[in-house]
Swiss-Prot record:
Compartments (UniProt record): Cell inner membrane
GO BP terms in the entry: positive regulation of translation
Protein's recorded name: Elongation factor 4
Species this chain originates from: Borreliella afzelii (strain PKo) (Borrelia afzelii)
Keywords: Cell inner membrane, Cell membrane, GTP-binding, Hydrolase, Membrane, Nucleotide-binding, Protein biosynthesis
Enzyme class: hydrolase
Cellular component annotations (GO), alphabetically ordered: plasma membrane
Gene name in the database record: lepA
Reactions catalysed, as given in the entry: GTP + H2O = GDP + phosphate + H(+)
Length: 601
């Protein structure tokens, strides 16, 4: 028996802020799966930070029932996906569990970098792509121009494009009819051995890991004994169901269904995203094609401001890891900042989100060190290895060469700002590999550049020089040779490990001067002179001096005898010299926080 033609699985993909979550809200309201009293905007964005920033961080699946104009009932399983490049892996998972995709395009902004990236991802997975022009209610909306972009830039049939306003609910019925008509029904048979793809999971404090999965073949019911094919571990199904905002329990799920199961799994790391679920008593012969394991690309250490809160921070990291398998961390320590954790993130936005969640959800104040990437060290003797922090960087005399990760940057910008964007990319060590005129008004730039150069202000700069019109997307390439050095900051000759950085040699002096000046402004004056230095190895490349606080020791001297005054000044000078020899400069953690923040900018 083949599965019902009335099931449709699709995802909503788009560039950031093109209206994906708003469209999902309209679908939910149309299906009446939640009362008007309980409804709120960004219904599928469960985290407070998602609502505040107006972004989607975690993909969310939901099942609705829709009665089409032909009188048939359709079960629509759809996934609302993130738009930011840091979370593109979430989009790839959603695409793998669907047969169709709604490609949302802002009627006022047109096709952007992430639009193109998501389109190709859906195209490579052979999804039926329905172009949707959103925000047609805006005064500067240009639907005809967007249709030309859809036809010329993406090669899609512009006549199939559906014009909507998700905010005002215009065109939603037409879009639902198009989904029922054009999105293919799932293939597969319930008679075949069970093969289901795990595409996500989350942790429930009471029931353990809740696994999100899509069934491609076979069927599953409560009480079945399942096997995860890659980890070869067996579990007993305690509960299965579908997503209808809240979890809705079902007795059985079959091929074509998107749902969840609970099987007493206590640790989220036991569930590998992309694994295949099958039955123990009738296993499938081969697993489904899974996903590449997500690897962190940005590294930073996190420390509690109050050293007594280390155990609280450990608990917070463990809890966050339960719901975010892409977060990695291990114990770390610093002489300046105490005990903390070295963490791996998917990008700067991911880092900011984790920091905010620690501070909000667990009421902890934390300091993060300067983000860095993973470098490859080829020593003069021995095998090559990777490092993620300045402390791991060996002396230059032991290194044969250093390699750093590169990216392929894809920037779409109006032609009037082309020169500005090229100047920014040049400053960031970018090498132009292609330039494509999409039309007379818009151009696509392809650059190869180091990942480390886009960590801090690259996105802000291209937005600034293009008045907000530039869009940016990137993908990781391979490692290439670089001229890397470790920049150390010394205060009175002592290295401050929390402020050490791995930097490109040509920009080392500029960074060193900036940090030294900032420290001079932040560190309180002492009764002795304080030297602040930026150094590469034994070579000092920048210096600032904080002059000592001087007491007027000659105030009690009267008359014109200069020798008495000289004796008092010499005595003061000797005392300050002894004080400098034995005095340690206490650097408050607020100073580290200020310097690290200014360094990010």
């Amino acid at each position: 028996m083949s599965i019902s033609i009335r099931k449709k699985n699709f995802c909503i993909i788009a560039h950031i802020d093109h209206g994906k979550s708003t469209l999902a809200d309209r679908f939910i309201q149309k299906a009446k799966i939640i009362s008007d009293r309980d409804f709120k905007s960004q219904m599928l964005d469960s985290m407070e930070i998602e609502r505040e920033r107006g972004i989607t961080i975690k993909s969310q699946a939901v099942t609705i029932t829709y009665k089409s104009n032909d009188g048939d009932f359709y079960e629509l399983n759809f996934v609302d996906t993130p738009g930011h490049v840091d979370f593109s892996y979430e989009v790839s998972r959603a695409i793998s569990s669907c047969e169709g995709a709604l490609l949302l395009i802002d009627a006022s902004q047109g096709i952007q970098a992430q639009t193109v990236s998501n389109f190709y991802m859906a195209f490579e997975h052979d999804l039926e792509i329905i172009p949707v022009i959103n925000k047609i209610d805006l005064p500067n909306a240009n639907v005809d121009f967007i249709k030309k972009q859809i036809k010329n830039d993406l090669g899609l049939n512009d006549e199939l494009a559906i014009s909507i306003s998700a905010k005002n609910g215009i065109g939603i019925d037409d879009l639902l009819e198009a989904i029922c008509k054009y999105v293919p029904s799932p293939k597969g048979s319930i008679k075949d051995p069970l093969r289901a793809l795990i595409f996500d999971s989350h942790y429930d404090s009471y029931r353990g890991v809740v696994v999100h999965f899509r069934i491609f073949e076979g069927q599953i019911k409560t009480g079945d004994k399942i096997r995860l094919m890659h980890t070869n571990s067996d579990y007993l199904i305690e509960e299965i169901g579908v997503f209808k905002i809240l979890l809705e329990r079902k007795d059985r799920l079959e091929a074509g269904d998107v749902g969840y199961f609970i099987a007493g799994i206590k640790n989220i790391s036991d569930v590998k995203i992309g694994d295949t679920v099958t039955l123990c008593d009738c296993p499938a012969l081969s697993p489904l094609e899974g996903f590449k394991e997500v690897k962190p690309v940005v590294f930073s250490s996190v420390y509690p401001v109050d050293a007594n809160q280390y155990d609280d921070l450990l608990r917070a990291m463990d809890r966050l890891k339960l719901n975010d398998a892409s977060l990695t961390f291990e114990k770390d320590s610093s002489s300046a900042l105490g005990h903390g954790f070295k963490c791996g993130f998917l990008g700067l936005l991911h880092l900011e989100v984790i920091q905010e969640r620690i501070e909000r959800e667990f009421d902890l104040n934390v300091i993060l060190t300067s983000p860095s990437v993973r470098y490859k060290i080829i020593p003069k003797k021995g095998k090559s290895y990777f490092i993620e922090s300045p402390e791991q960087f060996p002396g230059n005399e032991a290194i044969e060469s250093v390699l750093e990760p590169y990216i392929r940057a894809n920037i779409i910008v109006p032609t009037e700002f082309l020169g500005n964007i090229m100047s920014v990319c040049l400053l960031k060590r970018g090498v132009q590999t292609n330039l494509i005129y999409l039309n007379t008004k818009r151009v696509e730039l392809i650059y190869k550049m180091p990942l480390a150069e886009i960590l801090f202000d690259f996105y802000d700069k291209i937005k600034s020089v293009s008045r907000g019109y530039a869009s940016f997307d990137y993908e990781l390439l391979d490692y290439e040779y670089t001229d890397l050095v470790r920049l150390d900051i010394l205060v009175n000759g002592d290295r401050v490990d929390a402020l050490s950085q791995l930097v490109f040699k040509d920009s080392a002096r500029t960074k060193a001067v900036g940090i030294c000046k900032k420290l001079k402004d932040e560190i309180a004056r002492q009764q002795f002179k304080i030297a602040i230095q930026g150094a590469i190895g034994s070579n000092v490349i920048a210096r600032e001096t904080i002059s000592p606080v001087r007491k007027d020791v000659t105030a009690k001297c009267y008359g014109g005898d200069i020798t008495r005054k000289r004796k008092l000044l010499e005595k003061q000078k000797e005392g300050k010299k002894r004080m400098k020899m034995v005095g340690n400069v206490e650097i408050p953690q607020s100073v580290f926080l200020s310097v690290l923040k200014s360094n990010d900018n």
